[in-house]
Regions:
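Short, structured "edge-of-domain" segments at secondary-structure transitions
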Residues: 1-198
Length: 198
């Protein structure tokens, strides 16, 4: 935890909450409240940050919001958070990333997105312009009937491997370096063949 001073929590309805790690320094046997989740929402992810990261949130409909972590002030443990991305009522957030553009290896990182019908691609972080926290964001994958909705978003490097497991249990593994880097608003390439109903 030496380089991380905050924890950022994200929910499926696009709410984020940044809290100092110090707020969790006195755990109790029955746990501590980390966030008050509103009705109809649920916690999606938690990431550790150094206070100087950028947060990226993406929804199933293919839009991604990138903003400075400093746009969200630190809140107490029981607070419910602030709007991170503005999504439609029938949409939900599928991924949250904390990216440090000042890190030594920042150039080596790219954003990987995968759709429900097995399409995916990598894009440079610079392809995603910064927007205000709570905005609609920009298109991250060209969502079509062929691609299906967005299901995953990850911060990757060429040294990483990607594993995809479908509902019927078929697993494929590939080197991230084999997935070409493409523009932000393209549909990507087929990573796995998905059968009807899978």
């Amino acid at each position: 935890y030496v380089n991380n001073t905050y924890i950022v929590l994200g929910t499926k309805k696009g709410i984020i909450k940044k809290t100092s790690l110090e707020a969790y320094s006195r755990p109790r046997a029955n746990g501590v409240i980390a966030i008050t989740v509103r009705d109809g929402d649920e916690l999606l992810d938690a990431v550790l940050t150094n206070g100087e990261c950028e947060i990226l949130l993406a929804g199933r409909k293919g839009r991604c919001c990138r903003f400075d972590e400093s746009d969200a002030r630190a809140l107490g443990r029981t607070a419910s958070g602030v709007r991170g991305i503005n999504i439609d009522e029938d949409d939900e957030v599928i991924g949250m990333i904390a990216y440090d553009p000042k890190a030594e290896d920042a150039e080596a990182h790219s954003l990987l997105v995968v759709s429900e019908h097995g399409y995916g691609k990598r894009s440079e972080f610079d392809e995603y312009r910064k927007t205000n926290r709570g905005g609609k964001g920009v298109k991250t994958l060209n969502i079509t009937e062929k691609t299906g909705s967005l299901v995953a978003m990850k911060n990757v490097t060429d040294e990483n491997d990607l594993m995809i497991i479908n509902r019927s249990g078929i697993t494929i593994r590939m080197a991230v370096s084999n997935i070409k880097v493409a523009g932000r608003a393209t549909q990507g390439v087929r990573l796995i063949n998905i059968r009807e109903g899978d």
